[in-house]
Amino acid sequence: MVPATRISSQRLYNASLRNVPTLVSRDLDGDGIVEIPTQPDEAGLLNLSQSRRMDFIVWMDYTSSQPEKSFGLLDEETNCYIELPAEWEGNLKLTDSEEFDGAVELRTVDVDELVLTVRLARTSANSTGWTRLGVVASRQLQARMGPDVLLTDTNYRLSKALYLLN
């Protein structure tokens, strides 16, 4: 077992500052360890129209030698978290979708490549080509990967990426 690196209380306090009052520490993945949600500025860029309801979050386990536990997107309206591949951290921007009304797109910062589209749809909506993440606020939360996305993380599953935080 590798011992965890000590973190000062001031650094821990600064790292865990967040502007979403309902976002609290919790055992996100059920492993018995409480993870601390952080909102680092370098995690990704937000489009102004979406910045009031969505944010990039990194869940930290400061008892581990590798404290970054999970990276993803928090939807403040529905109080849910969508885990994203760690390899995307720091190279994403969140924008409104031009193709789908009310949907958001995650694009790479460097080449503006579409990596993921997320939408809330009626439960009766056509879901062909979409992965159903779950039901949130009586609607389906659906997502689909961009056409040219290749993941290096072979363990990542979009269908298992949704966490309800209520």
Report each predicted region and the residues it spans.
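Beta-propeller blade signature
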Residues: 1-2, 51-64
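Repeat-based blade/solenoid architectures
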Residues: 11-24
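Acidic/hydrophobic-patterned starts of short beta strands in beta-sheet-rich repeat architectures
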Residues: 28-40
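Surface-exposed amphipathic alpha-helical segments
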Residues: 143-166
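Secretory pathway targeting signatures of secreted, lumenal, and periplasmic proteins
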Residues: 85-130
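N-terminal "mature-domain start" segment
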Residues: 70-92
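Short glycine/acidic-enriched loop and turn motifs that connect beta-strands
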Residues: 41-47
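Beta-propeller fold detector
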Residues: 3-12, 68-73
